[in-house]
């Protein structure tokens, strides 16, 4: 079963939200593939992962780096899983063809953009019609934290 979590961003940009979610994933020893919109987004995310944590950095690689299989976080624009990740973070507004191969899919969207919200609703409806799926709608709180607002299926803990 794949758990799909829709992260409704209200007060944080994608580039700022990703490092916080990645810290949680790495703390649980999970590997992550981040599916980005384009190369420019990958560069911005990579910069954030290098600088988001004052005590260090979040180890990661991109399509341009050697040995993607070694990377705990792999940033890409392609639907691939070279690091054998169990978590897929989708930032490009798509429904990946092989999403069910992951234990968890995190779909982040800009809650301040009506088109982004409408597209997220369409993706939610699509996933809800799929077998063996648990859905969670996770709303960003004013302080930047997260709260699960709605669940469908058998959910796992929020990332």
Please name every model-derived segment.
Residues 21-23, 71-76, 150-157:
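Short, surface-exposed amphipathic charged segments that create phosphate/polyanion-binding patches used
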């Amino acid at each position: 079963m794949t758990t799909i979590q829709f992260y409704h961003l209200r007060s944080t940009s994608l580039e700022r939200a990703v490092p916080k979610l990645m810290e949680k994933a790495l703390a649980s020893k999970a590997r992550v593939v981040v599916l980005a919109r384009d190369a420019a987004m990958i560069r911005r995310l990579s910069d954030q992962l290098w600088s988001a944590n004052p005590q260090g950095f979040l180890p990661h690689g991109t399509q341009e780096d050697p040995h993607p299989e070694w990377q705990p976080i792999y940033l890409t624009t392609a639907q691939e899983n070279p690091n054998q990740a169990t978590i897929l973070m989708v930032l490009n507004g798509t429904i990946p063809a092989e999403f069910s191969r992951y234990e968890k899919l995190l779909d982040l969207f800009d809650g301040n953009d009506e088109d982004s919200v409408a597209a997220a609703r369409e993706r939610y409806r699509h996933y809800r019609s799929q077998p063996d799926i648990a859905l969670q709608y996770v709303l960003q709180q004013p302080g930047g934290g997260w709260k699960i607002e709605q669940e469908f299926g058998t959910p796992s803990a929020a990332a």
